[in-house]
Amino acid sequence: MNLRPYQEQAADFLFERDRAMILAPVGAGKTAITLVAMRDALHHGIVNRFLVLAPKRVAESVWAAEAAKWSPTLKIAVAVGTPKQRLAAFNSVADVVVTNYDNLQSLPHLNFDGIVFDELTRLKNPSGARFKALHKLIDCKVRWGLTGSFTSNGLEDVFGQCKIIDQTLLGRSKGAFQQQYFVLVNKDFGEWAPRPGSLEKVMAVIKPATFVLTGQSSETQLHTVEVRCDMDMANYKTMKEEFVLEGIAAVNAAVVVGKLQQLASGFIYDTKVVAADTPGRFTTTQTPVWYSSHKFDRLDELLQENQHANTIIAYTYKEELAELKRRYPKAQTLDDAGVIERWNAGKVELLLVHPKSAGHGLNLQYGGSKIVFLSLPWSLELYEQTIGRLHRSGQTQDVWCYVMLTNKTVDERIWAALHDKRTVSDIAMGELC
């Protein structure tokens, strides 16, 4: 298989630099690009052996499969599984060893001079255990980072990602980085806000080490459709009033949003604390109480309107998953053995996914082109990554994303918040182009 012209440019960019990052929309082919660059670097003796760090599911199922397509001469070993299996992979003669980030703190003595960080945002926190373990163990001359969500959650994320690639880009100290580009807005909580123009300045600094693929590289279009539905608002309004009276919003906004989002989907968890058999011990039980089936009824109509075309349905809560399974007994999840292969073969009509498990690197573009968000994740990164399972290199049809929103509920605020966060990402990508 051959790379597209824009992908060849990205592969050349990596090959020509020891320290570099590829920023690309989800599905633009970052893995294929990197495999070709790795192959060339190994062939020319620039690197003797590569280590790839990736999210677990991607390490297990993506890199070896993609290597067979794009760089079949590469010897790939996957260091995932039991300690014995991981050690065997590290001790093999493979050109490339792929492992997951969770294994960082138990890595054996390393003999790699090249490293690839698949989904670089996993290392955005320079004070995190992953970052510290990696910084201590690995000193490779060639460091490449891949991500589709560089600044999804704000400018502060950029520092850690750049530091692990090249400390000369933004310096060694996050404190100095904050002092230069941010203003302290809340000393008690350590909250910082970017100074005017900081985003543009930071992106200009890191531009020489960064290759950006824009959404224009995709051959297919992404269409986003709001699917609106109504519910009886009596219970919803009552709950909002109770939260205000009890002052819960000021203490734990996440609890408020979670409860209201549940109710916008038609149910709520009744949480009770129950005394356990052991004195002084308590357990928490959650029983779903249903008030409305409006979203699921509208989902039925939507699937019928699309003539039951193969569709991914993204959910947030376990009770949503349970109801989906009740309504659609033949629906499958990512936990079902061989489901990815069956989906890509067009043999799965409904695939139920949680955004946290359907993120980085999964190739689902061959089995369908429609995705429904029954409820939305709060994270822009999770939202984009989930859509990117379909809207990626290799997709032959326009992708249709349906976002189900209950009118006059927190659904609308979550949807608006995702758009607000997107502004930061769009500015960053545009500045680097």
Give the positions of each predicted feature.
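Conserved Helicase C-terminal RecA-like lobe
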Residues: 1, 15-19, 25-29, 33-42, ...
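Conserved motor-coupling elements within RecA-like helicase/translocase cores
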Residues: 84-97, 339-350
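Inter-lobe coupling linker of SF2 helicases/translocases
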Residues: 98-104, 109-112, 128-140, 145, ...
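A conserved SF2-helicase RecA2
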Residues: 378-433
